[in-house]
Design a protein with these regions (language model features):
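Histidine-acidic metal/acid-base catalytic patches
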Residues: 1-4, 9-29, 62, 91, ...
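Active-site acidic/histidine proton-transfer and metal-coordination neighborhood
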Residues: 60-64, 78-186, 196-198, 272, ...
């Protein structure tokens, strides 16, 4: 199993070349490249040469021995519920991000489902998401890349606490992947998101329920079950022995991909200390990969 580091913070701070160098020196196998900057009009991936720019990024990371193995589509758009904005701007940008990820060499890109709203039922959102993802299918086929659906959460606007959202329940998550019914759609389990809405299921329960055939991607991070902290494993309350046991027992074959908030790790740290911080993150991840391998049971 490959150990992958999320790159959004490091690339924004240091640029692609230096970020790739540091992650390679820390011992990671590959990276998850964020395309979040595409919400900004001046992002290079919004320009006419976006494929060439993406290919350049892919070459940089490959040359350092840490290829882009996963990407993340942009999602911090305004006006998701405005059908005109979604049709004319949001969807085309997400589709372009899929093309850019493929040009980098990523075999998979995580694309958030549309969220629940206060005025729509879960079934209505399910139907909208089926159209949304299926509209991406021609792009996936043309580029040879898989889209991973992620489990989400949201906050109650009146009370401020976390509540359920698209794919936040294991049964609904499985339904999404099964209904899409294509080799181009898989599940990305965000381990930290599972425990935020109130429910009995834990992250390892999701692993077992999604199973070997659906689960092909991860977002690895920790929290206190109250806030989406994106901490380093063991900094919160998630039981990592149970997570790794479940991954091994379903014979998970994807990457072990971090989605850590680097501001929480690095903070005001001087750049010369970044290598030490990355080695710390790497060593924990490598230990969790080893635990997963110890538990691995080959699927038939």
């Amino acid at each position: 199993m490959k150990l992958s580091m999320n790159m959004e913070y490091l690339v924004a701070r240091l640029g692609n070349e230096k970020a790739a160098s540091l992650v390679a020196e820390a011992g990671f196998d590959c990276v998850d490249y964020s395309l979040m900057d595409m919400i900004n009009g001046d992002c290079v991936f919004n320009g006419a040469d976006y494929i060439a720019e993406a290919q350049k990024v892919g070459r940089i990371f490959r040359d350092y021995g840490v290829p882009v193995r996963q990407a993340h589509a942009p999602f911090r758009f305004k006006d998701y519920e405005d059908p005109v904005a979604f049709r004319d701007h949001i969807f085309p940008t997400i589709a372009r991000s899929v093309e850019a990820a493929a040009a980098m060499g990523a075999p998979i890109i995580v694309v958030h489902p549309l969220h629940y709203t206060d005025t729509s039922t879960p079934e209505e959102i399910f139907q909208r998401n089926m159209k949304f993802y299926n509209d991406l299918l021609p792009v996936c086929k043309a580029c040879g890349i898989q889209v991973a659906v992620e489990n989400m959460f949201r906050r109650d606007q009146r009370r401020g606490h976390i509540i359920h959202d698209s794919c936040s329940r294991a049964e609904e998550f499985c339904r999404y992947v099964d209904a899409l019914d294509s080799e181009y759609f898989v599940a990305c389990l965000d381990v930290g998101h599972v425990g935020l809405p109130v429910q009995e299921d834990e992250a390892w329960d999701f692993v077992y329920k999604l199973g070997h055939n659906r689960l092909k991607s991860l977002h690895i991070h920790d929290n206190d079950y109250k806030n989406d902290q994106h901490g380093v494993p063991y900094s919160g309350k998630i039981d990592w022995d149970k997570v790794t046991k479940a991954l091994g027992q379903i014979d998970y074959t994807g990457d072990f991909t971090y989605e850590i908030s680097m501001t929480g790790v690095i903070g005001q740290m001087e750049p010369e200390l970044y290598p030490a911080a990355l080695r710390y993150i790497h060593d924990i991840g490598r230990a969790l990969v080893a635990k997963t391998e110890e538990y691995r049971v080959k699927s038939e």
